Amino acid sequence: VTGTPADEEAIRLACGLAKKNKGKIWAVYVITVKRSLPIDAEIESEIRKGEDILDHIETIAEEQGCEIETDLLQARDAAPSIVDEAAERGVNLILMGVSYKTRFGQFTMGEVVPYVLKNAPCRVILYHQPIV
């Protein structure tokens, strides 16, 4: 999760899939740590932001009657940490909410989504929130 409006609908979708398949949801927020800092640096503002986002996601999942585990990770780059954690935990599916972003007037998914799509050890579903 990244704190975008797409996260809420993605979690609702994940809850529907988890209930149907008797699965469990694991939501992760990755704090990207600059190379000038130690990887375990306590960046209070980012930690607070991540915890708030995860608390909100947890509330949504609980309202849906879903079992959810949340985790706050710190890494130099979010994409490899998502893939590595998925492999380590043996997840069956990665579901990512994607917001509409443009670069040079063209739709872009940024750097994280393409990396996860290419390197994930499991299936990946992208949820794109409709443009209002």
Where are the predicted features?
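Short, flexible loop segments at boundaries between secondary-structure elements
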Residues: 122-132
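A short acidic, glycine-rich active-site loop
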Residues: 42-52
